[in-house]
A protein has these predicted regions:
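Generic structural signal for well-ordered alpha-helices
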Residues: 33-37, 61-65, 91-98, 121-128, ...
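Low-complexity, acidic Ser/Thr/Pro/Gly-rich terminal tails and inter-domain linkers that flank the onset
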Residues: 274-296, 325
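Conserved, mostly hydrophobic/aromatic
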Residues: 45, 108, 160, 201, ...
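Substrate-binding cleft of secreted/luminal carbohydrate-active enzymes
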Residues: 202, 206-208, 214-281
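Intrinsically disordered, low-complexity Pro/Gly/Ser/Thr-rich segments with frequent PxxP/GP/PP motifs
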Residues: 327-364
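Asparagine-centered strand-capping/turn motif at beta-strand->loop junctions
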Residues: 300-313, 321
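Substrate-binding surface in catalytic domains of secreted glycosidases
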Residues: 118-224
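Chitinase-like catalytic core of GlcNAc-active glycosidases
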Residues: 22-27, 36-40, 48-162
Length: 373
């Protein structure tokens, strides 16, 4: 009983010590999204609720339907920067959209050019006056803190988020690219503290997939909704640096943390909640490809689990099999044996396909020819 209680206490401790909040960025709330949200419902959720689209001067909101129980969570509204050029219309659009929601907590996500920060601050101030009793927050990038006008923007809202992730898209495969620049992040955190304002930091759980043409020139960037199946030779990955993220959390224990975005079962390009639990403690998880053996009578089922990593390519793994199972018949699943493999025999090594972080992939079934005594 002591052991069980001790283990339960550890699990409870790590569950309680997860982040201060999660962004939910899915446009379709399928069952997997609801299940993921339910698992972290005790924490603060920042849910994408609507995106403003402007086409040929026509303004239209693309709204996202979410379960009733989450409609009082913080609503995130995405707005294109071009909307700032028509402040009166934008304020009216935002006012009507906000007052149609059941929450009093609103966050604006706008990729504001530095040259428009002063303009943005004026819009926020006017909107704040029209929405007494509402909690308004915004997201800012490190580049915004280089501008004096950022202080005015910050003063116009209740609090703000420093987004510490993003990527400068390369023009060629040979160029360097990363999800978080160490120098930029360190400078931004230092400047954010000098604002003497309430802010939180947003750290990435996701990876970008970059696609390149045969000549190496950049083709396309994927952040979600990409399967990654098939030929991956023209792809590269910009993944979270676990060591760097853990160091940020250790060095800034007084700053609330938000994760972007909430891992969902069908989201191939995010870290697992197991990984994020460790990171939230300032612990750097060790990447590994973990083998699991499960015996069911005369059958041995072998699977692998990608731990604490977002794999783009498959990996060669040596099968660890108990000696008494070496004489069995083998059927490969979701895996490829290396050259020289004879069907039905047990290969020494296999190629494990890439999969979602933390997901267990069946790779082989071994059956004994004679009943196991």
């Amino acid at each position: 009983m002591i052991t069980k209680f001790f283990l339960f206490s550890i699990v409870l401790f790590f569950t309680q010590m997860l982040s201060g909040g999660w962004y939910i960025w899915q446009r379709q709330w399928i069952e997997a999204v609801t299940q993921a949200a339910d698992a972290v419902a005790a924490e603060e959720l920042f849910i994408l609720r609507a995106e403003l689209e402007i086409t040929n001067n026509e303004w239209q909101w693309q709204r996202i339907s979410i379960p009733e129980k989450y409609q009082t969570s913080t609503a995130v509204l995405r707005v294109p920067a071009q909307a700032l050029h028509n402040p009166e219309k934008l304020i009216n659009e935002l006012y009507h959209e906000i007052t149609s929601l059941k929450t009093k907590k609103i966050q604006f996500d706008i990729d504001v050019p530095e040259s428009q920060l002063k303009h943005y601050a004026q819009i926020l101030s006017l909107l704040k006056m029209r929405l007494p009793g509402y909690e308004l927050s915004i997201t800012l990038l490190p580049c915004h803190l280089n501008c004096q006008e950022s202080k005015t923007v910050i003063q116009a809202v209740d609090w703000w988020v420093l987004q510490l992730h993003g990527i400068t898209v390369p023009t060629h495969r040979k160029e360097k690219y990363q999800l978080m620049d160490r120098t930029v992040v360190a400078t931004a955190l230092k400047k954010a503290r000098t604002t003497q304002s309430q802010f939180k930091i947003a750290l990435p759980t996701y990876a970008y997939v970059l696609s390149f043409h045969a000549d190496g020139t950049f083709r396309r960037l994927y952040s979600e909704g990409f399967s990654g199946n098939g030929d991956t030779s023209n792809l590269e990955l910009a993944a979270p640096d676990l060591q760097f993220i853990a160091s940020i959390i250790r060095a800034n224990p007084d700053i609330d943390l938000l994760w972007f975005r909430l891992p969902v079962k069908n989201d191939r390009w995010t870290l697992s909640t197991d990984t994020l639990t460790l990171l939230s403690q300032g612990i750097t998880p060790k990447e590994k490809l973990e083998q699991h053996n499960k015996i069911e009578g005369n059958t041995l089922r072998i699977s692998f689990r990608w731990c604490h990593q977002i794999p783009l390519h498959g990996k060669t793994a040596t099968l660890q099999i108990p000696p008494e199972w070496r004489e069995g018949e083998c059927i490969l699943l979701n895996s490829v044996a290396l050259p020289g493999y004879i069907y039905g025999t047990i290969p020494e090594t296999i190629q494990v396909p890439p999969a979602r972080c933390g997901e267990e992939i069946p790779v082989a079934i071994i059956t004994l020819r004679k009943p196991k005594s």
